Amino acid sequence: MDYQNNVSEERVAEMIWDAVSEGATLKDVHGIPQDMMDGLYAHAYEFYNQGRLDEAETFFRFLCIYDFYNPDYTMGLAAVCQLKKQFQKACDLYAVAFTLLKNDYRPVFFTGQCQLLMRKAAKARQCFELVNERTEDE
């Protein structure tokens, strides 16, 4: 009986790995509906706005793990890290968000803020100059 459990667990792990390797998210693998993800995001955002950063971080982390293609989740987690003064971690997350957002330079701007707060003025300036060069006045 244990052998069958191990084989089926190995098969499930293999199927999940194949799905993720082909671009599926854990949200897709587990069949989590988008409206549930939207509800979790609403809670995360509410916690963020209330200054309940630990709770917001927990929700945003879950959202990022289950749907790593959604830049809103990554931006949310990065913003939480920025407010918690985890500036390097925030910069790393903003970099991920920027790759997902392509031509949206908000993550670069927020990275510049983090660089300033880490007393890295030259890097901050590079970020702000890039934002200035690549965005149009709206």
Where are the predicted features?
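Non-catalytic amphipathic alpha-helical adaptor/oligomerization segments
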Residues: 75, 105-110
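Alpha-helical adaptor scaffolds
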Residues: 34-101
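TPR/TPR-like (Sel1-like) alpha-helical repeat modules
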Residues: 116-138
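A ubiquitous short alpha-helical element
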Residues: 28-29, 113-116
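Functionally engaged cysteine thiol sites
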Residues: 91, 110-114, 135
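Long, contiguous interaction/recruitment modules in multidomain scaffold/adaptor proteins
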Residues: 1-35
